[in-house]
Amino acid sequence: DPPIAPTVLLFPPSADQLTTZTVTIVCVANKFRPDDITVTWKVDDEIQQSGIENSTTPQSPEDCTYXLSSTLSLTKAQYNSHSYTCQVHNSAGSIVZSFNRGDC
């Protein structure tokens, strides 16, 4: 089967989360194959190494694609005014999604 690049969505913390001490940003990659996928998180263009949890969903029987959820956890103070980027790469290509905290 030919490789398929993922569809990527980036979700900022919910309003409820912003009242707690820890916030999470979730990057979801859907409908990709094969599962040779890497996720890179950047905060203000600096690659993040910690606070990341990835979970891959097994292939769908319909089209043999995979889904992945990657969560970046931050303290509320860390989250205040930065830009956040999730870069997802597999053999079909790279997809980059980002948002700026100041714009939300």
UniProtKB/Swiss-Prot annotation:
Residues 6-100 form the Ig-like domain. SMART domains: IGc1 (SM00407). Disulfide bonds join C27-C86. Coiled coil: none annotated. It comes from the Eukaryota. The keyword Disulfide bond applies. Keywords: Disulfide bond, Immunoglobulin domain. The keyword Lipid biosynthesis does not apply. PANTHER family: TAPASIN. This chain was obtained from pooled immunoglobulin of homozygous b9 rabbits. This is Ig kappa-b9 chain C region.
